[in-house]
Every structure is written in structure tokens, then in C-alpha cells.
Amino acid sequence: MKVAICGAGSLGTILGAYLSQADVPVQLVTHNLAHVEAMRDRGATVVGTVQMSVPVDARTPDQMDGPYDVVFLMTKQLDNEGTLHFLEPMLAEDGVVVTLQNGLPEPLVASVVGASRTIGCTVAWGATFRGPGVSELTSAPDSLSFGLGVMPEVPGYKTEQVRDLLSKMCPVQMERNFMGARFSKLLVNAGFSGVSTVMGCTFGQAAADRRSRVWLQRVIKECLDVAKAADIRIEPIQGIDVAKLLDYDNPVKQAVSFALIPLAIKKHAGLRASMLQDLEHGKLTEVDAINGSVCRLGAEHGVPTPCNDTVVRLVHEIERGERTWGFQNLDEFED
């Protein structure tokens, strides 16, 4: 079997370390030459809630040498189409692309490589890139999991093959209602990632501050309303029914939802959103693929999304240097 992680950044480096430790022949691929050289010299180093340093096969994209049986797609979605056209000729005849990305990437992936070669997957853990060769796992070790889509067009043996690979790192939940699982992750990203990014803080800090928690709750509520309108049944995350816990239709349920938000994110309180990490390094973000996905789907189904709209606007203004992240940005959300 030949495996590649395309986009070995904060998350991909950690997955690659686990797979390499389990003797899986996996290539960690990234454009970051300094990161590649560091991993070649010292291995992939994982710090944070887990400590390890593992020899890995690190490469730049021009050094890829398929055919690949499995490609874990972990790049940002800023140029998914171009990335997929680059990867498609390097897939084995029954090779698959596994979408470990934010947002709703599967339709575009399937349009390029084919539905029978596209497997959706959600990632329920977080990481922070700490420099060449080093990534920090920021989620508690007992809270790590993947949600692997059981896609009807994909042969069962390929799904099992991917499940077996991912299970070398942490538990894998098989998701037959994958859109529901994808939307569960999307509402967490839109809420906690979106709001914490414009504030410049961790998930836990955004949830702890009562003022920001108001807007975090409203962003999540918009996601839930959009899902209902689109007839998407949201799946539990790691056994937690986020829709049941956080949705509300009266003041009492709203108060309960508000109180539960810090508890819901407790094991991931130290996470810094990948969007915030991008902004800190002067890079463009995936906000259009995260909060923007909620806005677009809401528009299709006639559901207003003013809070998600505001997150998208603020993040783009920060990207352009027109504002900076910070708690002062909470003033931009309208009452």
C-alpha cells in the first residue's frame, strides 16, 4: 500500500507521525521546504498533550511518486481544484482521496476525481504548527476521533482500508449520514473557530467570556437553522448530541444552551483556530469554506445568517490589514 498526506501542516504532521510510528509507508507532503528538511533531519516531532518524535518520509509536491492507494487531503481549500487536478493522475486505479478538510469539500473533490474515489472524513481534534518539524497536539488524548463517511459509491473494502489506517491514531466513527456528521463539525468550526479567530483567542477563552459567548451561540444557532432548512440531520460528535444540547426555541432552552457551551468545548479549550494561525502568519484563511459555507447554504434555503456574515466580513478585513483581531471586534456584531 502507498499512502500520502497532502498538506502535512499542523494536523497532517501529527497524523503522519502516528502512521509512520505504526510502520505505514506514508509520505508527508508539503510546500514548506523548511518543514520538509526539519522532518528529514529530526523526524516529525509532536508536542503538547502527546510527546513523540518519529522518523518520516517528508517530501515536497514535486517529489511525489504515485500511484497512491490513499491520499489524505489536508491542504487548505484555497486552491482545492488545482490541487486535485495535480493529484488525480497519481492515484492508483482504485485509489481514493480522503477529505480531512474543513467546510463541505466533498462535492468539488468528487467532481474532479470521481465519486467512487472520494471519501469524506471529519477530524475531531486540533493542533498548532510550532515551527519546522514540530506540531503541537492541543486536544486531550482521550478526546481524539475521526468521523469516516460510508459513501455509497465507494467500494466497501476501500472504506475499511482507510478506517484501518486512521484507527492507528485514534477511534474512527463510521458515518452513514455523512452530511450530518460534516455539518456537526461545520457548526463547531463556524462557531468556535469563527468567533475565536476574530477575537484572537482560544476556543476556551471565547466560550468563557460571556459577551463573546452570546455571539458564539448565535453563530451556532444560525448553523442549526440552516441545517434544518436543508433537511440535514446533524449527527452527534464523540457521542455528544450538539444539536440537542445547543439548539433552542424558547428562553429557557436558550439559557441552558448558553450555560452548556463552555462544557461542550472543555476537552478542546486550548485549541487555536487554524484560521487564527493563518492570520498570525500573514496568510489567507478558509473562512469562505467554513462560515461562508453556512452563509451560502442559508441563502439557498432562505435562512438569514447575519452573525456568520459578520464573521466572514471581519476575517477578510483582517486578511487585508484593515483591522486586527481582538475582543474589540465584538462591537461589530449587531444586537
Residue ranges and their predicted role:
Residues M1, D69, L144-F146:
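Nucleotide donor/acceptor-binding cores
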Residues M1-Q51:
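NAD(P)+-binding Rossmann beta1-loop-alpha1 motif at the extreme N-terminus of oxidoreductases
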Residues I5, V29, L73, T99-L100, ...:
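Active-site-adjacent beta-strand anchor residues
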Residues A34-A38, E106-L108, G156:
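Short, charged/polar "capping" segments at the starts of alpha-helices
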Residues Q51-E136:
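Rossmann-like NAD(P)(H) cofactor-binding subdomain of soluble oxidoreductases
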Residues P89-M90, V112-R117, V134-D241:
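Internal alpha-helical scaffold of NAD(P)-dependent oxidoreductase catalytic cores
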